[in-house]
């Protein structure tokens, strides 16, 4: 069974949204030390229930808040998306040092991320 492991919030003005979430929810938000403009969102202590997420500059107008589902085999999961009426909208690509990522639309048009963890991804 695949679990939701991450959320991502798009922002037209990342600094404004960071300030909003820090002040309203008390979340800790830090710039990611990676190859893209991205911020890590910590929603609470690791030992408590919940998930953390990320914040990125909005790149596509139809993307809202997106959840990411962890999958054991991304290629197999993408084949399942296609065979069950979904659509791959961003193909598999590497997130260096993290894993392999793709974005899909389900049968109702909802956008989800799918991630296969792989620290060797490059």
Q: How would you describe each model-predicted region?
A:
Residues 46-52, 109-112:
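Short, charged/polar, Gly/Pro-enriched secondary-structure boundary elements
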Residues 9, 30, 78-79, 84-122:
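Vicinal oxygen chelate
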Residues 34-38, 61-63, 95-100:
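Short acidic/glycine-enriched loop/turn segments that link adjacent beta-strands
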Residues 1-18, 65-69, 116-122:
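N-terminal beta-strand motif that seeds the catalytic metal site of vicinal oxygen chelate
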Residues 2, 8-50:
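Core segments of cupin and vicinal oxygen chelate
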Residues 60-89:
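Mid-chain, well-packed structural core segment of small domains
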């Amino acid at each position: 069974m695949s679990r939701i492991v991450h959320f991502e919030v798009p922002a037209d003005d990342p600094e404004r949204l960071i300030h909003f979430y820090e002040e309203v929810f008390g979340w800790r938000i830090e710039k990611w030390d990676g190859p893209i403009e991205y911020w890590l969102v910590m929603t609470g202590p690791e030992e408590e229930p919940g998930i953390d997420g990320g914040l990125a500059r909005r790149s596509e107008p139809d993307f809202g808040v997106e959840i990411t589902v962890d999958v054991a085999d991304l290629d197999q999961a993408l084949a399942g998306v296609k065979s069950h009426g979904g659509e791959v909208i961003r193909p598999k690509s590497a997130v260096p040092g993290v894993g392999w990522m793709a974005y899909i639309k389900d049968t109702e048009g909802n956008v989800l991320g799918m991630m296969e963890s792989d620290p060797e991804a490059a």
